[in-house]
């Protein structure tokens, strides 16, 4: 009898857990796991909506969503640059929702038909270990052109466009500024100064933190975190201007928890949701002008930004990455 009672209780608990899991909002997150958890936990605390997160970088996430189109296994795609969400919209993988907060977002931070909304933005920057450059009697760079200085030979880390969307954003920035041919000429001229092309978009800031390199190129959060923690790191926004990512979210077509998916969109685009970016120390820049990113985090109007066409970015990625490998690496 005791065994039967225990078995009954165990079965009941498993049923409850399964029911709870079935009703949780399932999120495919292309935001890094640490920061995605911070934001989704804040969402749960604010709304009571439980979430289940599966981390997938942008390419695998889009492939999985497309493969599951006939039987969606997630409710929301959370993160990945907006050009990925444009592709998802074009492929019929998402559905529109006009959040009441959309009016507080500029056009670049939302789809006009409501298929995607931005979560945050991050500009590109150069992270500088001022102590190392000082010891080498090398100047602090102020521009993209400065990075070609022979004094920096073998001292710069940046991601590889073959594996990182961050590096692809660098290519797009330079194309927008200079034109395609001149952009690839610049990257070829920069190549002797590159210590290594990392696989991960955030690896350069890690190398900067441990003093492996004095110069790193990537999106700002890793640099801002190091500076906030007291490292001798300066964040430089090249004077010619920088590109930026617009990390976005979409509700997936056929979402089983549609109402809760809408709640996530509403919360993330609200003042409270945007405030969570700084409250949880993500070092991401808010997309609302009426919300501060927190101490040490710049506002968008303090940076010379270079906008790129997300549709062009989506349609030309394979070609441009292959050209980078050919022109810069000689592959």
What are these regions (language model features)?
Residues 127-132, 172, 246-258, 276:
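A bilobed periplasmic-binding-protein/Venus flytrap-type ligand-binding module shared by bacterial periplasmic
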Residues 31-34, 73-212:
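Extracytoplasmic ligand-binding site segments that recognize negatively charged/polar headgroups
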Residues 295-331:
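Extracellular/periplasmic bilobal clamshell ligand-binding domains
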Residues 24-87:
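Early extracytoplasmic/lumenal segment of secretory-pathway proteins
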Residues 252-309:
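Mature extracytoplasmic/periplasmic domains
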Residues 122, 186-191, 197-198, 229-253, ...:
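Periplasmic-binding protein-like
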Residues 83-87, 209, 213-232, 281:
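A ligand-binding cleft/hinge motif common to bilobed small-molecule-binding domains
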Residues 94-101, 116-117, 145, 214-215, ...:
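Short beta-strand->loop
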